[in-house]
Every structure is written in structure tokens, then in C-alpha cells.
């Protein structure tokens, strides 16, 4: 049986770590990515650097002996960018967030699509977007909402363009998830009030999001390509 290999970005913690564990539990070889490498199967790179996505892809292809079947775009940055900071601070934060949350995903998706077209094999991309891509975010997070909304447009475009080639694209839009990134924000905004906006009464766990990603990566039927799966405790219902 041919080994299935996945490249997953942002695997050091939270959703990315849970996705990597879930895939490995199904026998998938996972090549991870983090700002700092933790093992021989994790590639270290800072996606704020424009050249990093290409270097990650090339190293992943080498580690995988030329065969990557699944790409999961999970790496992300969620930092406040208030209106009253200096103009240059606001712009720097905007550009860093879009580069890490959107541009790196677009670059890696491009490399993956080109690879699968050349090999004639097909493949799957799973984009970890956000509820913010649908309904917007706080006044301090224009950049995050814009990046995640654009990721959804990227996902739909890939799905429509390459379905006939066996290249499938799925997106997941979590609401608040129990990660360090979201936890700091919940605490700063008064977590109880925000939880009141979630009919389920709690945030999602990383393992719940990982279960959806696992389904998209391995089990979702091809006819679902282009689908966006929400996981927000009914805090935003489309």
C-alpha cells in the first residue's frame, strides 16, 4: 500500500498539533511546519519571510521523496492591530498578518497544484479559515478577517478550477477554539460575555477541528470539493 503523505503548517500547538496527531493516527506520514523545528519531520520557517513558503515546499518534497498527497494550510497569526497605533505600525501588522495567514497559504497551494498537475495524481488541500471570514471580526482585527475571507475565496477558486484534474479543496471555518491564540483574546475581551454569543455554551476543542480536517483530507467524497464546513457552536449560522 502506498504511503499517504501530508504537509501541515503550524503544527507546534493547538489545531495544527491536533491535526498532525489525528492524521498520524490514521497512518498518514505528516511533515510538519513550525517557526522552530521540534523533530526531523518538522520544517522550521517563519512565514513572515516571503521566501519561506517555497523553501518549506521544496524541503517537504525532499523529505517525502517527491510525493505529497495532502496540504493543510493551518499556520496563522492572530494579534490585535488597534486603529490608534501609528500608521507604520498598523501597516506592518496588516502586512505580516496577510503574509502569514493568506499569502503563505496561496503560495503553498500554488506549489501543490503545480506538482499534482505535473504528476497527474490529484491531491487534496484543506484550508483552516475562520468564522471571521464570513462575519468579520473585532475592530482590532480587520487584517485577520480580511485574510480569512480571502482564504475562502482562494479555496473556492482552486476547487472550481482543478476538480476535473482530481485536485480537491475543502475549507473549515472554526469559531473560537480552545487554543493559546484564542485564549488570550477571550481573556482580554471578558470570556463570559463572548461565550454567551455561542449557543453551544463553549468553544470548540482542537480535536474537534482536527476531526473535520481528517475527514476532509481522507474521507470526504470528491463531490464535496469547494465545500466550507463551519464549526462555531451555532454562533454564526449561514
Describe the function of each predicted region.
Residues 12-13:
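Conserved glycine-rich cofactor-binding loop
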Residues 78, 214, 225-238:
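Short C-terminal tail/terminal secondary-structure segment
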Residues 109-110, 156:
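A short, exposed helix-loop element centered on a Lys and neighboring polar residues
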Amino acid at each position: 500500500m502506498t504511503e499517504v503523505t501530508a504537509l501541515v503548517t503550524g503544527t507546534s500547538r493547538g489545531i495544527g498539533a491536533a491535526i498532525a496527531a489525528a492524521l498520524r493516527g490514521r497512518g498518514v506520514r505528516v511533515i510538519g511546519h513550525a517557526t522552530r523545528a521540534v523533530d526531523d519531520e518538522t520544517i522550521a520557517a517563519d512565514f513572515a519571510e516571503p521566501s519561506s513558503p517555497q523553501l518549506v515546499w521544496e524541503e517537504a518534497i525532499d523529505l517525502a521523496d517527491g510525493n505529497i498527497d495532502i496540504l493543510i494550510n493551518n499556520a496563522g497569526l492572530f494579534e490585535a492591530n488597534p486603529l490608534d497605533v501609528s500608521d507604520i505600525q498598523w501597516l506592518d501588522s496588516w502586512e505580516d498578518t496577510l503574509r502569514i495567514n493568506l499569502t503563505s497559504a496561496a503560495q503553498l497551494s500554488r506549489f501543490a497544484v503545480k506538482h499534482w498537475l505535473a504528476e497527474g495524481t490529484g491531491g487534496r488541500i484543506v484550508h483552516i479559515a475562520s468564522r471571521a471570514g464570513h462575519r468579520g471580526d473585532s475592530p482590532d482585527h480587520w487584517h485577520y478577517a480580511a485574510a480569512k475571507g480571502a482564504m475562502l475565496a482562494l479555496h473556492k477558486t482552486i476547487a472550481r478550477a482543478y476538480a476535473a484534474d482530481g485536485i480537491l479543496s475543502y475549507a473549515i471555518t472554526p469559531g473560537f477554539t480552545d487554543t493559546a491564540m484564542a485564549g488570550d483574546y477571550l481573556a482580554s475581551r471578558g470570556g463570559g460575555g463572548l461565550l454567551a454569543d455561542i449557543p453551544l455554551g463553549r468553544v470548540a476543542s482542537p480535536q474537534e477541528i482536527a476531526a473535520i480536517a481528517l475527514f476532509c483530507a481522507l474521507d470526504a467524497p470528491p463531490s464535496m470539493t469547494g465545500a466550507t464546513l463551519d464549526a462555531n457552536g451555532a454562533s454564526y449560522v449561514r
